[in-house]
Amino acid sequence: MKLSELLAYDNIVIQCHDNPDADTIACGFGVYLYLKSKGKEPRLIYGGQNVIRKTNLVMLIRDLKIPIEHVDYLHKPELLVMVDCQYHSGNSAVFEAEHIAVIDHHRICTELPELSEVRSNLGACSTLVWNMLKTEGFDVRGNRELSTALYYGLYTDTGSLTEIVHPLDRDLRDEANFDPAIMRKLRNANLSLEELEVAGAALLHTDYVEEFRAAIVKVGQCDPNILGLISDLVLEVDAIDICVAFNLQPEGVKLSLIHISEPTRHSLIS
């Protein structure tokens, strides 16, 4: 699928997955700016119970002027574009639409619509959107805010760029015209003091299963994206290859299941 194929529709909504992370926000922003450049008036939304409150994501949205909005209800659009997720995949609110499009880098877990572009071998969906924008002749380097968002999306989804394998991921890393000052702020804003206390309490009570070299971490109430950060920290322990971090949410249980051998490490499951 090419981004230009979306131009056949007028009432367009771009949907990020629930509990948005930097990658899905950046992807939605990229598609949003492309459609705006072509005279469309899209909306950028996400659903679910949780409103974005993680410090770095609030900063990302504010500093890069990303017009994302949280919704509980969506009037049926002509086209719903899922970014960094798939329709009925379980990690995003289900809204009705006349037509569905999917742009994703995860493994295919549901039936894909005709309008879809899924590249499961990429480290981040930001790389896919970046490449699709370049294919359409969109000047990503000329937009510092978008370049920074896509670079940060790649940065966070590839373990601070340490898990890059695909050449396209390397190309985005090397070519992105990002804002160094904003990147420094984002890198140093992963945790608030409150979240640090939650993470510390969880780590103190980690259960270790020696037979499987696995750690199980129960986490208190926090932004679900904190689960991935805790898992990353736990996996730095030499005796641990698998980490399951979880917490109880009003709508169920959130899991972050990470194995060090997986190329795409973070899997947030409801």
Where are these regions (language model features)?
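Active-site environment of divalent metal-dependent phosphoester hydrolases
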Residues: 51-52, 88, 103, 161, ...
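Residues at the starts of beta-strands that form the adenosine-phosphate
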Residues: 11, 41-43, 79, 98-99, ...
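Anionic-ligand anchoring segments at beta-strand to alpha-helix junctions in alpha/beta enzyme folds, i.e.
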Residues: 12-73
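Fold-independent oxyanion-binding glycine-rich loops
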Residues: 16-18, 48, 64, 83-86, ...
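A structured phosphate/pyrophosphate-recognition subdomain
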Residues: 2-19, 29-37, 110-252, 258
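Active-site cofactor/cluster-binding pocket
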Residues: 59-115
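Single conserved hydrophobic/aromatic residue that forms the stacking wall/gate
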Residues: 258-270
